[in-house]
Design a protein with these regions (language model features):
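Feature for soluble, non-membrane regions of globular proteins
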Residues: 1-198
Length: 198
């Protein structure tokens, strides 16, 4: 059974991120969708005898969080590159929320980019916490370790090498981060926040 469907992302030519890198990256995303379905189906199969399969089920559930979060993180990531670069609206809710939290948009951006230089593979995620009304920046190892429970992703930056390997050596990942922001569609990020606030 296919519970999750692969989304289509029509991404125009980007500055500093090649079509080849996007093409290969999208193939990896499709793998996360496929594996999320595969693991979920295996869970349903082994749940027929949960006592006998308790350890197998435990490992499948662990694996599912990796595949599922990999799928969802990539959906936020690619969606933010669709439609070409759109500047952040300095009168918009997102900009004002960032200013309220960090003092200025520039200070937030410095912190976010700084987190992206964390050693290892993972994501930088800007979350909105509906309960407290605060925005939070967070490093997430792999796809799922460090995800903040109950918080909604607003902006996801993929810091796995596969996100930039065709364009930059790992020692130059800072250039990839700059390229990401050169192509970011802030209207999409604003929509992500509005969806949470509704």
């Amino acid at each position: 059974m296919e519970t999750f469907k692969t989304k289509t992302f029509l991404i125009d030519e980007l500055v500093g991120i090649s079509g080849k890198n996007i093409e290969e990256h999208l193939k990896l995303y499709k793998g996360y969708v496929s594996n999320s379905n595969l693991v979920l189906n295996k869970i349903k199969e082994y749940e027929k005898d949960p006592v006998e399969n308790v350890y197998i089920l435990g490992e499948l559930h662990r694996r599912f969080s990796f595949e599922f979060d990999g799928m969802r993180n990539h959906e936020y990531y690619f969606a933010s590159l669709v439609g070409g670069k759109k500047e952040i609206n300095s009168n918009g809710e997102l900009y004002k929320a960032i200013e309220k939290e960090w003092g200025s948009f520039e200070d937030w951006l410095i912190q976010y980019k700084s987190i992206s230089m964390t050693r290892g593979i993972g994501w930088v995620i800007l979350y909105y916490d509906k309960q407290s009304g605060h925005l939070l920046n967070q490093w997430v190892d792999e796809h799922h370790l460090g995800q903040l429970t109950g918080l909604s992703p607003i902006l996801c930056l993929d810091m796995w090498e596969h996100a930039f390997v065709y364009d930059y050596p790992t020692s130059e990942k800072k250039k990839y981060v700059e390229a990401f922001f050169e192509n970011l569609n802030w209207e999409t990020v604003e929509i992500n926040l509005r969806a949470v606030l509704e």
